[in-house]
């Protein structure tokens, strides 16, 4: 299969080679890229870790990861090609001198080194120092880091300062995997390639916007991490604000990385501050109690293994967000995300204003709003709810709600939509930063989020309980109902 012209010859170095992220996401994605013919024939994959492995041992680990986490049977021909790329470097990231071993394996003259930090952010400074001291940080070397970075503006700045000491911003790729999802990428095309939306995407025509990211799972044994982060830092700061920016941004001058990111930063700077004076009015936070998920009884958050019984960490957040700019003044954005909700789904719903004059009162006293639903997962696609006349000989215009539906898998006849990590890995190899988050984006998001988390801490108001398997605390319904609106119902 032909390799695309943009595929570059790389040494992909995975720090944390035996970790969960590498095994669940990175390795299966690399297999799919191999299958699609997107990896340059001379690209290598080098795992890094403290394990006393050689190439053969690491190859066995990779094979086991693919067998465990891929839904398809491994093609032996593809496996032979992929496994030939593999190598392993035994390295403790806190041992700066040991990075010379990695340097001896790399081919900086003929290959671009991509350092993927599949490890906790607390290790990033040590890794960058090791790479820098071993002179492995010169352009065009790149580093890839997973968000969220830190737990506040201050800790995020500390991490970015450590990275910035050895790598320039043009070398840094901060991953938010939601930006690699096909339907999120489609937002740019949907908004800016169709005059229907280009000319009807502001406070003159849109009433409000809802963004929901619902998780069916609990904390999945990650108590130590999650209790320090909570749903606000883990999901709102990390994913939902990026989706909000893609919905709310003004048209960029072009599709270059900085043009797109400049517009997203403008949105983040326009977010109305939420602090102690309005935090109870604008936010709801909850914590799941025992209930049922996927037909099984599940424990509450405070009953999870390793739990601190007095924890006030939120597992659910709902927020009314106001954007103070000319495009969105008066249009609320409602965000909600939580764990142990009834289903796993992510969607954006844009509600359009109803006509000022209703000509069809005989059929419908109060016309329902047209709404555009962008399904991020599952069943990726877009649908528009409109009113149509019911066929018949009746002289009245009997109206009925119908949907114009674009399902990705059906419309494009694709059984496999590329996983977000497939695209993002490929973009790092191409050297394209448009789908990655710039430092000022991260810091503007943290400024806004910190104001809320600080207000919660000062307010000393415990999260509202909600039973596992339900749509969060009743207070989240009350928040949106006060504005005369309601959350979208999932079918």
Curated annotation (Swiss-Prot):
Coiled coil: none
EC class (word): oxidoreductase
GO MF annotations, alphabetized: glucose-6-phosphate dehydrogenase activity; NADP binding
Catalysis: reaction(s): D-glucose 6-phosphate + NADP(+) = 6-phospho-D-glucono-1,5-lactone + NADPH + H(+)
Taxonomic lineage: Bacteria, Pseudomonadati, Pseudomonadota, Gammaproteobacteria, Enterobacterales
Family matches, as InterPro entries: G6P_DH, G6P_DH_AS, G6P_DH_C, G6P_DH_NAD-bd, NAD(P)-bd_dom_sf
GO CC annotations, alphabetized: cytosol
UniProt protein name: Glucose-6-phosphate 1-dehydrogenase
Source organism per UniProt: Escherichia coli O157:H7
Keyword Oxidoreductase attached: yes
Family as reported in the entry's similarity comment: Belongs to the glucose-6-phosphate dehydrogenase family.
Pathway: Carbohydrate degradation; pentose phosphate pathway; D-ribulose 5-phosphate from D-glucose 6-phosphate (oxidative stage): step 1/3
Active-site annotation: 239 (proton acceptor)
